[in-house]
């Protein structure tokens, strides 16, 4: 018996499971049952995810009496609100509820292997082991990094800690360029993603509806940021004193890191040095010496002093006056080590002049509503030759009292980037081609900006106006010019968000430059190559997911994988940090293989504290001697071997089910971590992804009344109706998966009872005719199609195929005058039972017909019979119309209208009753091919019952009828008498 291991992205247990969860889970459930039906040994486990901020935040809100959170719980029908002050109770309550809901639906989940990701020591030990191994391979480091941050609660905001609409939004890197205004005796710091266009600035934009303030500003560079800059540019491009000395310090630090890599605890020494860097130098040196001696690390005192100097290094710039919007921008600057003191408000900003630091030209400050005062610095430089927003903004200003300024700005326009297919003013070209007439046309302007930026970035070259950078490709010049600006004191590398949003705590988020943060090196080229190798050998449903994942593998840079003040697994070597929710759920599928043992220590006599790295190394990697490990840990050799065998038997995962929104993060991490830790034979084999879920064609929303939990749906419609509707929502495709509540109602009242009735049918023991052979072969074709649909995760197609077969079978029953052959009934019951993966409570037991290939000629019998009956019915209509015409044209027209479905009055129906009820005395069917005889003979009883008259069959070649000439192969002619 072959094994088959099915997993699905486990649910986050901060509420009841809803229909959105079910759309993904039903596909996993159907696949698991299908494989079981086909004889596989199937494992389908399910755990519960609770890592991160959402539960922590919700419990906190309950503890402070937040009315909105309390009302949310009450609407769920929860009465004992007090208990929800405790995050552990949230996890316990909703994981139990999720298990109940999926169990009521009859999911074949092996609950013995269930677990939660928090308050669960064996799982924490497993995650710790994973990160020790990643660190050992050099994929973990500490540094400064821009992350999304909630400044009110001082927490990193990951994808699970924000509204779903903002998942995937990351900090973007740009440059602040300082334009000095003599009028204001202050700098206007303009944020740009395109520093190479600074040579084409004709004005500065500010938002006229925003309050701007004057502030004292000083930038502080801590060692981590200095190190990041050095890493990016290979030197320190800063206008600071002692730059050479700082560069040498960083070089010496790098060399020391390389030397320490030979020691198993070398990285721990560096981490410890950082932890105690705040202590006096003598104490620092003494403590680090002791640590090195204890771990057997050879390090000289001068190297320890180097570490002390390195971790206590920071550089401050000279204080300057800046103009800033009085918005969240100031908070974001502070979180990136800008010291800011607000002096006062700015009364007049529009029409003042500022100097371009590169060209030394004076440019005016002008108003533009498109400037977002909460993004970047709330101040933007205007380059109308290359920015559609800027060009349209100036056109709009020409219509105002600032016409003179706008016209002069447009006269000063110069091309900075040359790109084939555009004039010297590419922005003007694209604005006119897209017929953009106002800065209010945001969507069109965004598309124009993206299109032009992409074209110029990949194909553009700098013109003579770019001074010493003339001739450089844009993609090369961008960072060189950023480096030039920083080196000359004209600007800084800076991070912001493309759009401002709120965290689940309800606060606006910023980009923070976190120091001492822990990162995973997803930027590592060799690691990316391994991930790509895995992808090439995997199956994806639908196939286009493959390219999306490959793009994301290439796109990912290093990832901040630790947060603070959250639920989860503490980082083993730095426990003040917690491994965040996407990063602890990467290889948990391996934990399923042993969870039934580790989650039940009383049964297997396991002390969770003894779950060492050696235990997991043996179980998952086959390293070490189980006898020795048993002696050290007290875990019996037998249990160790059983865990190893369980992993070896079940792994790898044969197919993983997930939702479209997890392509960009979880599924990419899932692949990265598997290839880093496990041998190639244990890499994932397949991934199935479904599109976004809608209910009645709309996104689920409580305000729309279409947000329905699984338990509500079961209570309202019944479990198999819910399963059927969830399966019918869609295939594994990147299109909306729509749960139709009308279909669910119909499933409850019509479809399910109808299917149940089929299982009670009985057949007749009579001679088999051509119609019986047709339906048996039609059912064989059904099974062939079902195999394709089940294998390719297409449950909607499975159901539709059944509906088609159902129509054909009912047609067959009618043709045989409700006396179906017992073999046909036997086959049809198997066809119904093949729906066991979808509706197991109705079907009760599965069935499959094996490898019986359909006979194509017999399949065509049904189509032939259907066409004969339609042609005969049409012929009889024409005869009746002709009979009516012999009486009057009016009656003929009424008969024709009747057959076309027109509404007639009762009087009109009475007038034509004799014609529409007329039945022939005899119907002669003239066929051309002798092979048609048996089929036509077998449908004579049906024709005589439905159409009346006696049916006579004649071979065209033997017929004396004039119409015999009209008979064609498998298209008989009719003579009506």
From Swiss-Prot:
Q: List the disulfide bonds.
A: none
Q: Which GO terms describe its molecular function?
A: aminoacyl-tRNA deacylase activity; ATP binding; leucine-tRNA ligase activity
Stored PROSITE patterns:
AA_TRNA_LIGASE_I
Q: What is its EC number?
A: 6.1.1.4
Q: What catalytic activity does the UniProt entry give for this protein?
A: tRNA(Leu) + L-leucine + ATP = L-leucyl-tRNA(Leu) + AMP + diphosphate
- Chief place of localization: cytoplasm
Coiled-coil regions listed in the entry: none
* InterPro entries according to UniProt: aa-tRNA-synth_I_CS, aa-tRNA-synth_Ia, Leu-tRNA-synth_Ia_arc/euk, M/V/L/I-tRNA-synth_anticd-bd, Rossmann-like_a/b/a_fold, tRNAsynth_Ia_anticodon-bd, Val/Leu/Ile-tRNA-synth_edit
Protein name per UniProt? Leucine--tRNA ligase
- The gene name reads leuS
């Amino acid at each position: 018996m072959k094994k088959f291991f099915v997993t699905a992205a486990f649910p986050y247990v901060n509420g009841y499971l809803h229909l959105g969860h079910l759309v993904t889970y039903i596909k996993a459930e159907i696949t698991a049952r299908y494989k079981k039906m086909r004889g596989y040994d199937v494992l389908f486990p399910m755990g519960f995810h609770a890592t991160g901020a959402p539960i922590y935040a919700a419990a906190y809100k309950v503890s402070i009496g937040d009315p909105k959170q309390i009302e949310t719980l009450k609407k769920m029908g929860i009465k004992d609100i007090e208990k929800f002050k405790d995050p552990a109770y949230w996890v316990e309550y909703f994981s139990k509820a999720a298990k109940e809901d999926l169990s009521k639906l009859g999911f074949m989940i092996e609950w013995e292997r269930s677990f939660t990701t928090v308050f669960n020591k064996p799982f924490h030990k497993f995650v710790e082991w994973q990160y020790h191994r990643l660190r050992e391979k050099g994929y973990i480091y500490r540094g400064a990094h821009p992350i999304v941050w909630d400044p009110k609660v001082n927490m990193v905001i990951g994808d699970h800690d924000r509204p779903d609409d903002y998942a995937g939004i990351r900090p973007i890197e740009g440059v602040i360029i300082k334009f000095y205004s003599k009028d204001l005796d202050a700098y206007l710091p303009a944020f740009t993603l395109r520093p190479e266009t600074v040579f084409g600035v004709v004005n500065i934009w500010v938002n006229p509806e925003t309050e701007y303030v004057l502030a004292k500003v000083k930038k502080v560079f801590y060692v981590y940021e200095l190190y990041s800059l050095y890493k990016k540019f290979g030197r320190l491009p800063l206008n600071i004193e002692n730059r050479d000395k700082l560069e040498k310090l960083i070089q010496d630090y790098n060399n020391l890191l390389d030397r320490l890599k030979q020691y198993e605890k070398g990285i721990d020494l560096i981490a410890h040095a950082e932890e105690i860097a705040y202590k006096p130098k003598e104490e620092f040196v003494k403590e680090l010496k002791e640590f090195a001696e204890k771990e057997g690390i050879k390090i000289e005192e001068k190297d320890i002093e180097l570490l002390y100097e390195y971790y206590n290094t920071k550089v401050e710039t000279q204080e300057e006056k800046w103009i800033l919007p009085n918005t969240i921008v100031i908070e974001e600057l502070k979180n990136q080590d800008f010291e800011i003191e607000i002096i006062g408000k700015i009364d007049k900003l529009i029409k003042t002049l500022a100097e371009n630091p590169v060209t030394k030209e004076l440019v005016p400050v002008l108003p533009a509503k498109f400037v977002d005062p909460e993004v970047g610095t709330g101040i933007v430089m205007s380059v109308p030759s290359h920015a559609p927003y800027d060009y349209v903004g100036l056109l709009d200003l020409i219509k105002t009292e600032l016409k003179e300024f706008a016209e002069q700005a447009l006269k000063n326009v110069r091309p900075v980037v040359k790109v084939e297919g555009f004039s010297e003013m590419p922005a003007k070209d694209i604005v006119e081609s897209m017929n953009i007439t106002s800065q209010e046309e945001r969507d069109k302007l965004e598309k124009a900006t993206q299109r032009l930026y992409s074209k110029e970035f990949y194909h553009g070259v700098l013109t003579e106006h770019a001074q010493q950078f003339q001739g450089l490709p844009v993609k090369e010049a961008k960072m060189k010019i950023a480096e030039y600006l920083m080196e000359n004191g004209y600007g800084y590398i800076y991070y912001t968000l493309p759009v401002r949003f709120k965290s689940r705590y309800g606060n606006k988020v910023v980009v923070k430059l976190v120091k001492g943060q822990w990162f995973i090196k997803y930027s590592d080229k060799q690691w990316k190559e391994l991930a790509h190798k895995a992808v090439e050998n995997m199956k994806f449903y639908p196939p286009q997911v493959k390219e999306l994942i490959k793009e994301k593998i290439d796109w990912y840079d290093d990832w901040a994988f630790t947060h603070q003040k959250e639920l989860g697994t503490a980082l083993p070597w730095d426990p003040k940090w917690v491994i965040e929710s996407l990063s602890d759920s990467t290889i948990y599928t391996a934990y399923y293989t042993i969870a039934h043992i580790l989650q039940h220590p009383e049964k297997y006599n396991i002390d969770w504290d003894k779950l060492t790295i050696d235990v997991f190394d043996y179980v998952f990697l086959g390293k070490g001697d189980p006898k020795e490990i048993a002696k050290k840990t007290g875990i019996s050799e037998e249990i160790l071997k059983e865990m190893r065998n369980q992993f070896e038997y079940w792994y790898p995962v044969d197919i993983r089910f997930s939702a479209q929104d997890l392509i960009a993060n979880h599924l990419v991490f899932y692949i990265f971590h598997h290839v880093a830790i496990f041998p190639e034979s244990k890499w994932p084999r397949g991934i199935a992804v479904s599109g976004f879920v809608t209910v009645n064609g709309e996104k689920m929303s409580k305000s729309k009344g279409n947000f329905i939990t699984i338990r509500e749906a079961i209570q309202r419609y019944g479990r198999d109706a819910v399963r059927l509707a969830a399966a019918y929502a869609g295939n594994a495709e990147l299109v909306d998966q729509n749960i139709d509540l009308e279909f669910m109602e119909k499933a409850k009242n019509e479809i399910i009872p109808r299917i149940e009735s089929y299982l009670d049918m009985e057949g007749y023991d009579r001679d088999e005719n051509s119609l019986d052979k047709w339906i048996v072969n039609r059912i064989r074709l059904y099974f062939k199609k079902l195999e394709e649909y089940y294998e390719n995760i297409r449950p909607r197609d499975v159901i539709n195929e059944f509906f088609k077969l159902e129509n054909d079978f009912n047609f067959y029953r009618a043709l045989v005058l409700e006396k179906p052959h017992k073999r046909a009934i036997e086959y049809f019951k198997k066809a119904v039972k093949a729906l066991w993966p979808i509706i197991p409570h109705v079907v009760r037991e599965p069935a499959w017909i094996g490898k019986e290939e359909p006979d194509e000629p017999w399949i065509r019998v049904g189509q032939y019979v259907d066409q004969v009956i339609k042609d005969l019915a049409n012929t009889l209509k024409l005869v009746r119309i002709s009979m009516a015409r012999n009486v009057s044209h009016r009656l003929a027209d009424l008969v024709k209208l009747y057959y076309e479905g027109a509404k007639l009055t009762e009087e009109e129906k009475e007038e034509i009753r004799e014609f529409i009820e007329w039945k022939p005395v005899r119907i002669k069917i003239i066929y051309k091919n002798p092979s048609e005889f048996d089929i036509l003979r077998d449908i004579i009883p049906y024709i005589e019952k439905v159409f009346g008259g006696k049916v006579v069959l004649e071979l065209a070649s033997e017929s004396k009828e004039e119409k015999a000439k009209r008979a064609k192969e498998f298209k008989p002619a009719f003579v009506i008498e």
